Amino acid sequence: MNVMRRLKSIASGRTSISSDPGGDYALKRAKLDQENDNLCVDPMQVDQNSSCFEMKADVLSQESVAGTSNVPAVSEKPVDDQLPDVMIEMKIRDERNANREDKDMETTVVNGSGTETGQVITTTVGGRDGKPKQTISYMAQRVVGTGSFGVVFQAKCLETGEQVAIKKVLQDKRYKNRELQIMRLQDHPNVVRLRHSFFSTTDKDELYLNLVLEYVPETVYRASKHYTKMNQHMPIIFVQLYTYQICRALNYLHRVVGVCHRDIKPQNLLVNPQTHQLKICDFGSAKMLVPGEPNISYICSRYYRAPELIFGATEYTNAIDMWSGGCVMAELLLGQPLFPGESGIDQLVEIIKILGTPTREEIRCMNPNYTEFKFPQIKAHPWHKIFHKRMPPEAVDLVSRLLQYSPNLRCTALEACAHPFFDDLRDPNVSLPNGRALPPLFNFTAQELAGASTELRQRLIPAHCQGTGSSS
């Protein structure tokens, strides 16, 4: 059934919208899970025999842009900076120095690609500013994610025994890697940490960038799927914790780093299953959005793609991340994606089924250049009918504030952090179900709170944390 016939059927009342927003979601879920099994190893599990680290393997949509590549996408300006000759000649960079200056390192990759089990990759760090050279060796343990971007493998540092994840991507020698440049700027408890990076070559003289990342043993996707398989809903405390940390990380990215992630989805949200600290990963699609400068609209995995992207907007804002965050929150509450479209247009149908037909003004806010307006008039489906009757009203309210057609009406990340839905987290007596203390939630830096009103600050930081500079 084409998009117009489907919308007309919904408008006429022939197609109902039940508590299963996707309608035939079970079939779509089965197809999705099969794609997961075929395209990528499952995200990391808690048990030691099956733990893995899922990154950019986009199993939700073949339409998603794998922006990790250094080759600029169509209509998006390339990163013009040329790589220094020393990098082309296989000198490597150490990202751990405080002043962001580059340090040369040499790398050796023994026979093979460096990703086979047991393969050892040796790099030499230091050798500048009077500091001695230090050899670091990583033993590849398993490939845990593949995609058009390259490969991610789990490795062990032989000197320290530390587990890391190494993301290996083909490097275009003409350009700097945008993902690397962005990750070098970041330092936040809810953003995956870049330990350092190095370059390696193959027998075909191909240059690869290797990002050495901290290892986090779970994903929100896997955690959610765990409860779905048991026919249970994720405990509300975990929905609160994960959503809050997503919003806090997005506030940091948007306001401090000045970056839009552009691919927020459960697979890109890492979680420590013991502490429940969340970290956003995979900055292969991330970009600093410049007002007036066009960007590609074919970005973000489909289920989490903001409507302005579907309408072809090229001058969008960080609000696309807030839409994606709202979709993730709704999915955790429902146990399934809220908008499970099977194509770009089908995605719009799923959104309209719940939000109703966008008004002309809403379409103008999403894309001023979009003039076509032929959609049947469909009324918005009440949010309280989408979720279970016992769902906290604060949860429903926050979802509704994030999933607005007009990007400028969506609450900002910092405003979301102050929402009453998270008041339970601000209770000094609250703890994790396992008895542990909550992960750091309120240790905001001055940069994170820059521009926030006194009232907002008071709502953000609970009384028992104010003036202490410490987190819960």
From Swiss-Prot:
Catalytic activity line of the entry: L-seryl-[protein] + ATP = O-phospho-L-seryl-[protein] + ADP + H(+); L-threonyl-[protein] + ATP = O-phospho-L-threonyl-[protein] + ADP + H(+)
GO biological process assignments: protein autophosphorylation; response to brassinosteroid
GO MF, one annotated term: kinase activity
Post-translation changes: Autophosphorylated mainly on threonine and serine residues.
UniProt cross-references to InterPro entries, sorted A to Z: GSK-3, Kinase-like_dom_sf, Prot_kinase_dom, Protein_kinase_ATP_BS, Ser/Thr_kinase_AS, STKc_GSK3
Example of a GO cellular component annotation carried by this entry: nucleus
Keyword Kinase: yes
Record keywords: ATP-binding, Kinase, Nucleotide-binding, Phosphoprotein, Serine/threonine-protein kinase, Transferase
EC number: 2.7.11.1
Statement: the UniProt record of this protein carries the keyword rRNA processing: no
Residues annotated as catalytic: 263
Residues bearing PTM Phosphotyrosine: 298
Domain Protein kinase: 138-423
Family to which the UniProt record says this protein belongs: Belongs to the protein kinase superfamily. CMGC Ser/Thr protein kinase family. GSK-3 subfamily.
Entry protein name: Shaggy-related protein kinase theta
Biological classification of the source: Eukaryota, Viridiplantae, Streptophyta, Embryophyta, Tracheophyta
